[in-house]
Amino acid sequence: MKKWECVVCGFIYDEAEGLPDEGIEPGTAWNNVPEDWVCPDCGVGKDDFEMVEI
């Protein structure tokens, strides 16, 4: 599982954890997150996220 970081605000999407409050189940790969999903902290789209090694 990978982690993706918002380059604008630093929010981390962790594939292992998902975002259950937003309907994204734990274990959901980044490419399976809906294309219209936006960062819950700053509102930018998936194009503004980069994979990170933590």
Swiss-Prot record:
Cofactor(s) in the UniProt record: Fe(3+)
Superkingdom of source: Bacteria
Pfam families linked to this entry: Rubredoxin
Annotated family: Belongs to the rubredoxin family.
GO molecular function, one term: electron transfer activity
Compartments it resides in: Cytoplasm
The protein's role, per its UniProt record: Involved in the hydrocarbon hydroxylating system, which transfers electrons from NADH to rubredoxin reductase and then through rubredoxin to alkane 1 monooxygenase.
Binding site for Fe cation: 6, 9, 39, 42
Protein species of origin: Alcanivorax borkumensis (strain ATCC 700651 / DSM 11573 / NCIMB 13689 / SK2)
Keyword check for Metal-binding: yes
Annotated pathway: Hydrocarbon metabolism; alkane degradation
Bound cofactor: record note: Binds 1 Fe(3+) ion per subunit.
Alphabetical keyword list: Cytoplasm, Electron transport, Iron, Metal-binding, Transport
Ranges for domain Rubredoxin-like: 1-52
Protein name: Rubredoxin-1
